[in-house]
């Protein structure tokens, strides 16, 4: 085709399953239509009338909600096992024969991030080999095994090993759960459903803080980690009964299974719409399958580095993920109880619950506005709030710690107005973080083409956890070396750099199909092209409404004329 060089794909029509004469006929017609609109003179015109009308009327089915909730159990385990360490570090006391120093606390915290990095980088290839849902089950095994090692720990080294094993599950959950949800979700609800994963993560963190309050006694931290085994075992037990992602089924030639899942996901939609949707997906997956057969894992990784349509989504995903971590949020998740203990609060774990609760609440806010407002707009609106919260927190630390050489010294009674301001500004920072970066980061795997989506999910999560290691392994050291004011000011500066990156390198994916997102990176970072396609969608939708209104009006006029004649 004349446009093949623009897209790097061949649009040969794939073979079709025996789906009955009616559906097969619809698929024949739909595929021809899809090939026509998939390679237009204007690459932004990607939808025919059936898809344009259908995607705006897609319904959220119980089946899809159930799949999202199932996958989000991994997110709950992720959140619980990263949040539980905050209270555990305070309650361990001398259970290992001595009081933990700051270096040991950093190693225990960072071990999970190290394991998560390995889990994230390996889980993408595993998901492409055994499937999305079974990779989540592998993550459950890591969650369970890690918790058992931790619960039986009687040394710092064993604790670190257990936390690293736990991290393998965290990395797997971070990479694959949002990928699975995005691939089963209707286009209209994809952003909101992926946010269910974020709600589960923050809910797990909040729950870990809640149970940390009563379990502060001797060996209470062992019970805290043991509780985290329960959701992992439950998810692993039911995974067999759930469907695979339709995209993965098609990649493995399970076309009837893929169509059955599409039918259940789009229940209530017309057969014509489902046929067009399936044909479009089938074609893109066929192209991806051809690609996968001709490329090894190493070759794919080289393509990410050398070919623009893969490199640019990788830069976008890595940038969003790295800035999410380097902003310092997880320093609060891991060390909130430690910070508030040093700041003189009587019950630091309870105060940490305010931080975690804020994060959870505003994750719900994000879910309600994500697809309506748009992910890019939300990020550009919330990053300034994050910067302001961190900058004012650094001012509060400066005023608060004047009597101790601008260092936090445990056991010091600091001025209440400044400690309260510090807490308030942390809450402001977290509110903006949870509404934007905390949620949207886990959706940017959708920016990768299907043939690279498993690798892309690993790249994203790998970048996130590499940056997380930097934060978790240096926070207490930074606080001791330069003090809290410069530390939080540094995080504010990193957020400013993140805001600039988002403005130039993050296109708006909301309202675009996963297949459309592949096209926009043929035009730089796709910021302007995404805007054009979305505007074109709105224009076409308005034209369709105008035609419908004109038809209704014409019918009404005809009826009036007939009535007048009578």
UniProtKB/Swiss-Prot annotation:
Q: Which domain of life is it from?
A: Eukaryota
Residues on the membrane's Cytoplasmic side span 1-64, 128-140, 185-192, 244-313, 371-377, 443-458, 507-566
Compositionally biased residues, Polar residues: 556-566
> How does it sit in the bilayer?
Multi-pass membrane protein
Q: Name one GO molecular function term.
A: myo-inositol:proton symporter activity
Residues spanning the membrane? 65-85, 107-127, 141-161, 164-184, 193-213, 223-243, 314-334, 350-370, 378-398, 422-442, 459-479, 486-506
Its induction, per UniProt?
Expressed during growth on inositol and during sexual reproduction. Expressed during infection.
Q: Which reaction does it catalyse?
A: myo-inositol(out) + H(+)(out) = myo-inositol(in) + H(+)(in)
Where is this gene product found? Cell membrane
**InterPro entries assigned to the protein according to its UniProt record, in alphabetical order:** MFS_dom, MFS_sugar_transport-like, MFS_trans_sf, Myo-inositol_Transporter, Sugar/inositol_transpt, Sugar_transporter_CS
Q: Which residues lie on this side of the membrane: Extracellular?
A: 86-106, 162-163, 214-222, 335-349, 399-421, 480-485
Ranges where the record places region Disordered: 546-566
Q: List the NCBIfam families.
A: SP
Q: What does this protein do?
A: Major transporter for myo-inositol. Plays a role in the traversal of the host blood-brain barrier.
The UniProt similarity line reads: Belongs to the major facilitator superfamily. Sugar transporter (TC 2.A.1.1) family.
Name of the protein in question:
Myo-inositol transporter 1A
Q: Which organism is the protein's source?
A: Cryptococcus neoformans var. grubii serotype A (strain H99 / ATCC 208821 / CBS 10515 / FGSC 9487) (Filobasidiella neoformans var. grubii)
């Amino acid at each position: 085709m004349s446009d093949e060089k623009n897209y790097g794909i061949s649009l040969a029509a794939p073979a079709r399953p025996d789906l009955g004469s009616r559906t097969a006929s619809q698929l024949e017609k739909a595929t021809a239509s899809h090939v026509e609109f998939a390679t237009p003179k204007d690459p932004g015109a990607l939808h025919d009338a059936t898809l344009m009308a259908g995607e705006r009327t897609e319904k959220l089915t119980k089946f899809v909600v159930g799949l999202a909730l199932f996958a989000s159990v991994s997110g709950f385990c992720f959140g619980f096992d990263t949040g539980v360490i905050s209270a555990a570090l305070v309650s361990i006391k001398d259970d290992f024969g001595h009081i933990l120093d700051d270096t040991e606390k950093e190693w225990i915290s960072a071990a999970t991030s190290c394991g998560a990095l390995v889990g994230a980088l390996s889980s993408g290839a595993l998901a492409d080999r055994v499937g999305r849902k079974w990779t989540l089950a592998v993550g459950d095994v890591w969650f369970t095994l890690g918790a058992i090692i931790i619960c039986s720990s009687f040394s710092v080294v064993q604790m670190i090993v257990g936390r690293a094993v736990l991290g393998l599950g965290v990395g797997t959950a971070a990479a694959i759960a949002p990928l699975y949800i995005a691939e089963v979700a209707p286009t209209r609800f994809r952003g909101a459903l992926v946010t269910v994963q974020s709600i589960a993560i923050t809910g797990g963190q909040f729950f870990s803080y809640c149970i940390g309050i009563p379990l502060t006694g001797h060996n209470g931290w062992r019970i805290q980690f043991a509780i985290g085994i329960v959701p992992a075992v439950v998810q692993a037990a039911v995974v067999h009964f759930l469907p695979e992602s339709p995209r993965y089924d098609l990649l493995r030639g399970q076309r009837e299974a893929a169509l059955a899942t599409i039918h259940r996901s789009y229940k209530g939609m017309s057969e014509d719409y489902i046929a067009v949707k399936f044909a479009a997906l089938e074609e893109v997956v066929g192209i991806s399958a051809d690609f996968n057969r001709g490329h090894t894992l190493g070759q794919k990784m080289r393509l990410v580095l050398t070919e623009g349509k893969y490199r640019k989504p990788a830069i976008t995903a890595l940038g969003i993920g790295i800035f999410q971590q380097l902003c310092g949020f997880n320093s609060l998740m891991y060390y909130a109880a430690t910070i508030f203990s040093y700041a003189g609060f009587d019950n630091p774990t309870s105060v940490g619950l305010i931080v975690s609760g804020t994060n959870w609440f505003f994750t719900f806010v994000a879910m309600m506005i994500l697809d309506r407002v748009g992910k890019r707009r939300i990020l550009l609106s919330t990053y300034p709030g994050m910067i302001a919260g961190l900058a004012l927190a650094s001012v509060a630390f400066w005023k608060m710690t004047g009597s101790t050489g601008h260092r936090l010294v445990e056991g010091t009674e600091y001025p209440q107005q400044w400690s309260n301001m510090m807490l308030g500004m942390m809450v402001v920072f977290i509110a903006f973080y949870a509404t934007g970066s905390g949620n949207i980061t886990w959706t940017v795997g959708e920016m990768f083409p299907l043939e690279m989506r498993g690798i892309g999910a690993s790249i994203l999560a790998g970048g996130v956890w590499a940056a997380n290691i930097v934060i978790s392994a240096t926070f207490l050291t930074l606080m001791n070396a330069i003090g809290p004011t410069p530390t939080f000011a540094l995080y504010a500066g990193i957020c400013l750099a993140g805001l600039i990156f988002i403005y130039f390198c993050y296109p708006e994916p909301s309202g675009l199909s996963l297949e459309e997102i592949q096209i926009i990176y043929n035009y730089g970072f796709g910021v302007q092209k995404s805007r054009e396609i979305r505007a074109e969608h709105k224009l076409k939708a308005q034209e369709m409404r105008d035609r419908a209104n004109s038809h209704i009006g014409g019918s009404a006029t005809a009826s009036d004329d007939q009535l007048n004649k009578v």
